[in-house]
Amino acid sequence: LRDATFAPPRALTQLAQITDFDLFVSTTFDSFLEQAINAERFQGAQSTEIIGYSPNRVADLPTERENLQRPVVYHLLGRVSASPTYVISDEDTLEFVCALQSEHLTPEKLFHELEYNHLLLIGSNFSNWLVRLFLRMAKRRRLSDPRDVGEVLADDHSGSDERLMAFLQQVSLRTRIYSGAEGFVD
């Protein structure tokens, strides 16, 4: 996979064109987002900074978001590598999520940025409970607590998940749901 030359999906190319976005958190282990950003912003030059989380080696942002010199793609669930340091199963997901909640294994600068900035979760295929857990981890407080920033979920299934919708309507009024990742970036 590391040497494969697949083209990034059109939705990622469109997302990469939004130059106000400089910090991307990916839950996939592929390099499509990196390729799209490099193609759209740097004429294909390898200029995007790539960081991959691993429970056995915490990698954090090099600096606060406002001081980033170039776009960053942070692979929250790992990235393709020779060693098994990326998520490919439900058990892997569980281990990564548990590690991310551990005081000593949390990328602090990244989670500070997630806590104090608006979030766009686009195209994820997280289950109902994983969406809830990710939002809670990112915001570092109860979702029902008042906050100045909101979240947008743009995917193919969250809007039709009645239990997730009921939960978000009850406790997270700042979260907005849009149907379809590709339609959202159009």
Describe the role of every protein-language-model region.
Residues L1-T5:
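Metal-dependent phosphoesterase signature
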Residues G52-L61, S89-E108:
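Active-site glycine-rich loop that binds ribose-phosphate moieties when present
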Residues V73-A82, Y86:
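Class I SAM-dependent methyltransferase SAM-binding "motif I" and its flanking Rossmann-like core
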